[in-house]
Amino acid sequence: LPEQSSLVLSLHRVGVKFPIKKGLLNRVKDYFVAVKPLDLSLNRAESIGIVGESGSGKTSLALAIARLIESTGNIVLLNQNLNRLTERQLRPLRKDFQMVFQDPFSSLNARMTIEQIIGEGLGLQKLSKAEISSRIDEALLKVELPIDFKQRYPHELSGGQRQRVALARALVLRPKLIILDEPTSALDRTTQRAIVKLLRQLQADYQISYLFISHDLQVVKALCQRIL
């Protein structure tokens, strides 16, 4: 067993099921099981890949771990059981785990500048304007984007650049865990390789743990020490 201090995330019998409602009264008649109960442990600076076809429940699992949908079982992040916390109790912990989605264009607000997008989560922290600006600059440099991209909008960037912005938005909060849901599937092979290389470098620099969800075994093997 890994030593307790290095354990970032552990799942115990975590499952996801959606109610099937029928009839005039819209009563629950049955459940669709999206994720069968599973156990998992993830250490600091480790990457685990979850591979499966579309519809296999991979995204449901990611959303459950991020507490964006309900699940059964125990999700323990940094010794806190997320499934036992209210949304209010969860809020200060959200900086410790971030999610990067498949399509950066739909997950980035088209009306916001890159600076506003990356800095959005910092508004909840007690930081001065200068500190926020400095953190945004640092995040842009870490994902290898020019500082002057701050004034641009998502539609002005390529797919690969938008995914780097999505990573910078996660990174700026200095999380312990990043959940990546098909983060390279909308990108060409060359851009995929560049993003995987960047993820490796960020992990080495910040000791971040990754839960990497993909149907692409080649990409998963390039990044992950373990594959489920």
Regions found by a protein language model. Name each.
Residues 73-81:
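Conserved ABC transporter NBD signature motif
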Residues 153-157, 161:
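Conserved ABC ATPase signature
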Residues 25-29, 82-98, 116, 124:
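ABC ATPase NBD coupling module
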Residues 172-176:
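A short, proline-enriched helix->beta-strand linker immediately N-terminal to the Walker B motif
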Residues 220-222:
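A short, surface-exposed alpha-helical micro-motif characterized by mixed small hydrophobic
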Residues 130-148, 201:
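Conserved ABC ATPase "signature" region
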